[in-house]
Amino acid sequence: MVVKTWMPWLLVSSVLSQGCCQHWSFGLSPGGKRELKYFPNTLENQIRLLNSNTPCSDLSHLEESSLAKIYRIKGLLGSVTEAKNGYRTYK
């Protein structure tokens, strides 16, 4: 008797969980579909950006976060101590 009432509730809960977790991204269109009227503008902007002759070497505005620096140093120190202990990591 318990199994007979348990199975329909399991089915209903699984269907409801899928229904309420549906991803609606751009303009409430399912699957992230965009209207075609926006496509030429973005495509033209991308082509214009690719054809621009601006140098990309100026990266002074980008800074590494302190947390990223800590993890990078931690990885470096870990590899140095493993090398001293005779461990070798193969990738």
From Swiss-Prot:
Disulfide bonds: none annotated. The keyword NADP does not apply. The modification Pyrrolidone carboxylic acid is found at residue 22. One of its GO terms (cellular component) is extracellular space. GO terms for molecular function: hormone activity. Residues 1-21 form the signal peptide. InterPro entries: GnRH. Expressed in the cell bodies of a cluster of neurons in the preoptic region. The modification Glycine amide is found at residue 31. The keyword tRNA processing does not apply. It is found in: Secreted. Keywords: Amidation, Cleavage on pair of basic residues, Hormone, Pyrrolidone carboxylic acid, Secreted, Signal. Stimulates the secretion of gonadotropins. Teleost species possess three paralogous GnRHs: mdGnRH and cGnRH-II have been identified in tetrapods; sGnRH has no tetrapod ortholog and is thought to be a duplication of cGnRH-II. Belongs to the GnRH family. This is Progonadoliberin-1.
